[in-house]
Amino acid sequence: MSNPTHKTSLHLKEENNQVSPKFSLRRNLILACLLVGVLFSLTGCVNFPHQPPEKGPNIPQEPKLFIIILDALKHKTLMESLDSLPNFNGVIKGNKLAYPYIYFENVLVSIPSSSKPSNTTLLTGVYPCRHGVPSTLWFDRKEEKVITLKSITQRRIVNILEKTDTDTIFDYARRSGKSAMAVATQVTKGIDRRDWIKQSVHLWGQAFWVNLFQDGNSIPDGAHLDRGTTKGLLGGHMYTLTDGLEGKLRTTGSIPDLTVVHYIGMDIFTHYPRRFMVKENWTVDEIQRWYLKEVLDPELGKIVAFLKENRLFENTVFFFVADHGQTRIVKHIDERNFEQRLAKKLKVRGRPYSIREADIVIMPGASTKVMYVKNRMGADWMSPPRLLEDVKPVIDALIDDKDVEEHLNMLLVAQYPGERDKDLKGPGESDVFWFFNPNSYRQSDRKDDDFLNALEPLSKLDEFVGKELKAAYMYRRDFDRKNTPDIILINKPGYHFTPDRGKYAHHGGIYADDAYVSFVASGPGIHHFSDHPRTITRQIDTLDLVPMAAHLAGIKIDKPIDGKDRLVELK
């Protein structure tokens, strides 16, 4: 091997072949710094072991749990596609069907099925009314400001969970003495910053250019993001000094007890599929099956290869979950024009009124859309609006809108039990919302009595969408007092408010395509918990993930949550 010091000196020697002591010291310092920098880049961490540990576990251990969040994966799609997915098939069913997998076929998402509340519910095990994240954007009536959760750092979700004293699976793992890692997750409370591998701005920028050049689409490429997620899982993140599985194994001799990986690419890809798919009118199921085969199955193969290479695979359990589904968009509703038309009749925030000046605040929507109505006699937004004087004029304006008449299926109206209209003749206030049928009211004279008679029990909602979706039950657990909207518009399936007409599919609704997903737990370590393959058709909820994951990873849940451990019920 050549001597780098000698090579350097050849270029720097003086005429008498002498090097001054001062220069020699400087040169050695530079070389030493370069050497340290190279080692630092290769390892991606700052903790170096004195000697490399042997590969694989040396003594029997509890299985290592991998929770793989497949964002927006529809109900049953994964299990129905296994024949074309060799890596998923190998992890779920095993060689010669050896693994006694547990398949939860019908898992209900907390509604409406938007990303931030769905993921927060998924990893906390409690409903939005408890964890405080009811949507991606909402109006805080008490603070009189709009809250938005569009952030790479996810710090705002952490702040909300701390304020509501809500713990995550990572909190429970830490208190149970279990190590954990989170990769590209939207919920990070409880995870040490050195154990959270996030998707960098660089990765998203690369994904944008990749999709622009290969498909002419100015939307980040979901496949590039997911490949970057796997790379981060295995190799870590050099800019934030976080170790991936390779670094953890090298420095500690093991991998985390719990690893949560969020593959967000399918959600983006289903929103904006390849142009040839749009041209050929592919269904959402066809798009997602293609993505599973071409993108996610190879990524899972990389994880399995790493685990097998290091003799770790036989001691793992994989829990594949989804946060919500997707629905093909039938028609885009022009949100701006909709608000502009309402602004001709009402004082709408931003058109041009401030929150203090406005009578209503309209939030961006998808399959559903919420509105906050001000009590014009009240001092602030926390005062319940009067039914006839404040709420009825807004609904009258909505009923006359041409888009609403075409796309609206039903309305919900907030009740405020015990806070208003105590002497008002009409329906009692004992629930969070009333069900309001706009079609029957539209045909009436729209007098005060007609309006009050159109307010029906919230349970009526279940008759419209199907009792199995538990829509009324879910809406009772979505909002807390300070963020409860006064009016919720629920569109027909496939009708979406969206400013982007290029979007092919979306979520955020209360119907089956959005609200049903599936879970499956398997892998070589699943034999500790199951003795034969099981398909559970009984309905469970996404918030049941936390107690079931705790069961699989030996984590103690030390405070009340809403989710239930469905694995105990299998015994």
Where are these predicted regions, by residue range?
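His/Asp/Glu-rich, glycine-adjacent segments
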Residues: 126-282, 498
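Active-site-proximal N-terminal segment of extracellular/periplasmic enzymes that hydrolyze or transfer
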Residues: 48-102, 561
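Acidic/histidine-rich catalytic neighborhood
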Residues: 315, 322-378
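Active-site neighborhoods of enzymes that stabilize oxyanions during catalysis
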Residues: 166, 358-548
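Metal-dependent active-site segment of extracytoplasmic phospho-/sulfohydrolases and closely related
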Residues: 87, 295-339, 412-414, 423-428, ...
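Short, structured active-site-proximal loop/turn typified by the sulfatase FGly-forming signature C/S-X-P-X-R
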Residues: 76-131, 181-182, 531
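C-terminal motif of bacterial Sec signal peptides marking the signal peptidase cleavage site
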Residues: 43-44
